[in-house]
Amino acid sequence: MKSVILFRHGKSDWNASYGGDHDRPLNSRGIKAAKKMGLFLSTKNQIPDIVISSTATRAKTTAQLAMESANWTSKFMLESGIYGGSPNYLLELIHTQKDKYDSLCLVGHEPNFSSFISIATGQDYINFTTANMAKINFEVD
């Protein structure tokens, strides 16, 4: 059994001065939520083996704050393709890690996370709000 946690970045600051969407930072609410979700996973004993984050500032900061808030020892890496990546891209990314890790956390964006969750679980489209998480367990051979 392998598990994937999809973690949408915290609330971002639309009023901040930044170079483009990729560089948009978290706002104070997003910072607080990222830390809270990191602690939540820790209290549930669900700390992933690896965290793979989008390179977008708001996602990368979310991942780092979650990890720091509860002293996760997870491996951390950035993956530019998560930003704007299709559900198929996310599946391929997960597939490349299946022999290395039992659990992983992807930190990224909408609408690709909602689409991926819907496809992976066979459910209708879901609304995946900021700083939200979904865990999916996969049977692998």
Predicted segments with their positions:
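Active-site-proximal alpha-helix that buttresses catalytic centers in soluble enzyme cores
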Residues: 2-3, 7-81, 85, 113, ...
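Active-site-adjacent alpha-helix immediately C-terminal to a catalytic or transition-state-stabilizing loop
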Residues: 60, 73, 88-141
